[in-house]
Amino acid sequence: MNYTKMMQYDINNWDGVNATIFFSGCKFHCPGCFNKEAWDFDYGYPFNKKAENLFISYGKNEHVDRMCLLGGEVFHQDLDAILDLVIRIKREVKKPIHAWTGYTFEELLEDDKKRVILTYIDTLVDGRFIFEKKDLRLKYRGSSNQRVIDVQASLQTGQIVIIDDLYL
């Protein structure tokens, strides 16, 4: 499993200051994707224990508000390693986790391992990027089919809880 970039002070992908990692590898290959180089699973650097520890240390910084997981595709990675990472974030960093995926929330719920990972994620931007639905006014996402989901509220209620008012 590889990552393309790790940022300690990211202000682009969510409000505030975020520790962000972009994982390598995506099978969706959405036309118009902003991060095509991350489609290649071999691109970037090995996500080993040293890289994981560095990312965790970024999150422990008092100026960092949350942890962001992007790609590539987070859920095309070694799911055991992703689960270990989100568990460590919740135990050691104790900050919200935001993730982006080309899967829909419903698709993730169909897979037991992906569903377990969701129990540690606070906010999910779901859905494949669709170039024809691209909207530069949207916050946190690129096309209007993508949703910003309150994962914990959705899991508790059994209904998808959308976070509204996300226009620039």
Regions found by a protein language model. Give the residues of each.
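N-terminal [4Fe-4S]-dependent radical SAM core
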Residues: M1-F22, K27, N35-F41, I160-V161, ...
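Conserved Radical SAM active-site core
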Residues: N2-T4, N35-A99, Y103-D112, I117
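Flexible, glycine-rich phosphate/dinucleotide-binding loops
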Residues: N12, E106, K133, T157
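Short cysteine-rich clusters marking metal-coordination/redox-active sites
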Residues: C30
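Conserved C-terminal portion of the radical SAM core fold
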Residues: K60-L69, R91-P96, V125-F131, L155-L168
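P-loop/Walker A phosphate-binding loop and immediately adjacent motor/lid segment at beta-alpha junctions
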Residues: Q77-V86, K134-L168
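Receiver (REC) domain switch/active-site residues of two-component response regulators
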Residues: D122
